[in-house]
């Protein structure tokens, strides 16, 4: 059995660069921007909540104001008697979307491992764009307002959007091996934050013309992106005659970044028994089953942890612009632009923390330290003054310590789990494992969005932040066995290196 840190060469970022071709760059950019566009359309909904709430409630509350007749002509858009009920319904729509999104993730992961990933991704992007157009633009143009219709459209939108993440992570996992995966996926997982920034920017630019145009712009761009993905995305190196990732590129070494989660220390003795099919082989690897994927080491613990963390991350995603407008009285367009700083912090956090995890060759300790700081940053942001510069700084710090770990779990760690030794003979496990992790996270986020609106309405925003602190602490609790295990391995490797010297 090999001694950790001695005879086996550790994966390095230099090896990653040396194997990178222009196909890798194109795949990186296409998957990056395809998911950015999906997130931009989601962000649009959160950015126009104030405008939608105003449209759905009476504008004149003075009892002396005369009533316009006929009622169905002048007041058909007044779905709710006051802004509080409209806000609660918007929270319900968020919950509906996330529940259907979570269910769709479990299904999309399985479908993505059995069908062409390019077809599934492009279909989801184009179809979701049409649903967003119907929801926000066509209904307003036709002056058609119906709560049940909105709910049905958002269920369908959640199912269609769920095709995105498992597919793009699987494609990235097919092209990029374990060497430098923390850094590459940390940088690449900024796609969600870039999408949030893009959605906020597009919405703020056209919101003065009406919220329906914000939906129109993002839906049009997303549909065009789906067409480009269908025409240009390569889902695997074998499509252009390049060899697929081999065992050495996957870094199946004992000092591997997730080795404590992936199997026993002597698993590398059987390393030669695993291989990825050659480019000229016609046989397809058998896709892993759903329950088999759930039983893989680390999948359940990271899924539960991500359920708590995604609840917090998506609460900022859905409610931050509304919170800034509601709590500080800032204009909606200003709140949209200021909320970008949370995503900027998430981009920087995901990249830096991914790089650190590559250097340490461990993921869980990096997550634990970041989440401990996240608790403090949440407490600090809950007491942020009515000052835009100070609010933006604390918001970026909060995004760094919450968005960073969230990006790492949903991308690099999911790819690690989907390509561990136990599934080395089945390269069709990536989308399934990613769907399980992200699907479980979305269930937690779905429950959280309704709880946020409920807590805010009854107890106020301060208790919402206390709830976030509790969820961030629960994330640490779920991954604590993995943290202890990886720290022990780090200390063991350090002792061996000292003895070798």
Swiss-Prot record:
Task: Give the GO cellular component terms, alphabetically.
Answer: endoplasmic reticulum membrane; lysosomal membrane
| Native source species | Gallus gallus (Chicken)
Disulphide bridges in this chain?
A: none
High-level lineage:
Eukaryota, Metazoa, Chordata, Craniata, Vertebrata
The entry's localization annotation reads:
Endoplasmic reticulum membrane; Lysosome membrane
Outline what the protein does: Unlike the other SLC37 members, seems to lack glucose-6-phosphate antiporter activity.
Q: Which residues cross the membrane?
A: 20-40, 87-107, 119-139, 153-173, 183-203, 214-234, 298-320, 340-360, 364-384, 393-413, 435-455, 459-479
Among its keywords, does the record have Endoplasmic reticulum? Answer: yes
Q: What is this protein called?
A: Sugar phosphate exchanger 3
């Amino acid at each position: 059995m090999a001694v950790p840190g001695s005879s086996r060469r550790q994966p390095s970022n230099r090896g990653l660069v040396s194997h990178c071709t222009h196909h890798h760059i194109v795949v990186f950019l296409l998957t990056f921007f395809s998911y950015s566009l999906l997130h931009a359309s989601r962000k649009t909904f959160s950015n126009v909540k104030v405008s939608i709430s105003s449209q759905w409630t009476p504008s004149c509350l003075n009892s002396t104001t005369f009533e316009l007749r006929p009622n169905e002509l002048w007041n058909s858009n007044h779905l709710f008697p006051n802004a509080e009920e409209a806000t609660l319904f918007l929270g319900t729509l968020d919950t509906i979307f996330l529940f259907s999104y979570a269910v769709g993730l479990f299904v999309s992961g399985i479908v993505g491992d059995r069908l062409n990933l390019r077809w599934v991704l492009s279909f989801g992007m184009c179809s979701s764009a049409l649903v967003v157009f119907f929801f926000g633009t066509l209904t307003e143009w036709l002056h058609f307002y119906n709560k049940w219709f909105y709910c049905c459209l958002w269920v369908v939108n959640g199912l269609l959007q769920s095709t995105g993440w498992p597919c793009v992570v699987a494609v990235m996992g097919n092209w990029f091996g374990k060497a430098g995966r923390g850094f590459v996926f940390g940088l690449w997982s900024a796609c969600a934050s870039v999408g949030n920034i893009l959605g906020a920017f597009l919405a703020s630019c056209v919101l003065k013309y009406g919220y329906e145009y914000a939906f129109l712009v993002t839906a049009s761009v997303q549909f065009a992106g789906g067409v480009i993905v269908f025409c240009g995305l390569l889902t695997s190196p074998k499509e252009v005659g390049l060899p697929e990732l081999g065992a050495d590129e996957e870094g199946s070494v004992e000092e591997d970044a997730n080795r404590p989660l992936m199997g026993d220390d002597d698993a590398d003795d059987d390393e030669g028994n695993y291989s990825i099919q050659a480019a000229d082989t016609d046989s397809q690897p058998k896709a892993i089953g759903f329950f088999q994927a759930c039983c893989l080491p680390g999948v359940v613990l990271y899924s539960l942890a991500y359920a708590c963390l995604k609840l917090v991350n998506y609460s900022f995603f859905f409610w931050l612009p509304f919170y800034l407008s509601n709590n500080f009285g800032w204009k909606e367009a200003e709140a949209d632009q200021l909320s970008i700083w949370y995503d900027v912090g998430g981009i920087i956090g995901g990249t830096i923390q991914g790089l650190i995890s590559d250097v340490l060759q461990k993921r869980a300790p990096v997550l634990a330290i970041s989440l401990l700081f996240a608790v403090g940053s949440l407490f600090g942001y809950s007491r942020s003054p009515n000052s835009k510069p100070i609010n933006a700084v604390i918001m970026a710090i909060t995004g760094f310590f919450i968005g960073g770990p969230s990006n790492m779990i949903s991308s690099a760690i999911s790819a690690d789990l989907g390509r561990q030794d136990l599934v080395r003979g089945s390269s069709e496990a990536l989308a399934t494992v990613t769907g399980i992790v992200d699907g479980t996270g979305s269930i937690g986020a779905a429950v959280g969005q309704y709880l946020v609106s409920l807590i805010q309405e009854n107890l106020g925003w301060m208790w919402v932040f206390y709830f976030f602190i509790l969820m961030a602490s629960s994330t640490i609790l779920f991954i604590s066995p993995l943290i202890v295990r990886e720290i022990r391995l780090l200390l063991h490797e350090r002792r061996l290196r000292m003895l070798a010297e």
